[in-house]
Amino acid sequence: MAKSSKASSAAAKKLSPEALIRSFESSQQKDDLPEIYVGDTVRVGVRISEGNKERVQPYEGVVISKRHGGLNQTITVRRIFQGIGVERVFMLHSPQVASIKVERRGKVRRAKLFYLRERVGKATRVKQRFDR
């Protein structure tokens, strides 16, 4: 009888595969991320390594989509550079992302702002939201 109780306690200590993955992911996640919503204008500090030096390059634009959750959470940031639309996808918990700062809140009524791709000039502006 003592053997069966020992075996059951060992089985209780062993985590299920999902719980093991969750515990590992929670240790890898960043906890200092701001609340980011679609439509916000954000400045992402991206780590760039050139030779043996490392520097942080800012990338500022409008968040047009958010995907996934947990460790694999990504945002797509769009900006216009020299008249050409440039989009980058950032994994929020990646070590390449040094910092994220919300510059201004946007007021939108969609979860994905892919319609901004077809717009030009002032039509790409997003109204500002003051309540968040």
Swiss-Prot record:
Family membership: Belongs to the bacterial ribosomal protein bL19 family.
Top-level taxon of the source organism: Bacteria
Function: This protein is located at the 30S-50S ribosomal subunit interface and may play a role in the structure and function of the aminoacyl-tRNA binding site.
Species for this entry: Synechococcus sp. (strain CC9605)
GO CC aspect terms: cytosolic large ribosomal subunit
PANTHER family referenced in this protein's UniProt entry, alphabetically: LARGE RIBOSOMAL SUBUNIT PROTEIN BL19M, RIBOSOMAL PROTEIN L19
Annotated GO MF terms: structural constituent of ribosome
Keyword list, A-Z: Ribonucleoprotein, Ribosomal protein
Name of the protein in question: Large ribosomal subunit protein bL19
One Pfam family, short name: Ribosomal_L19
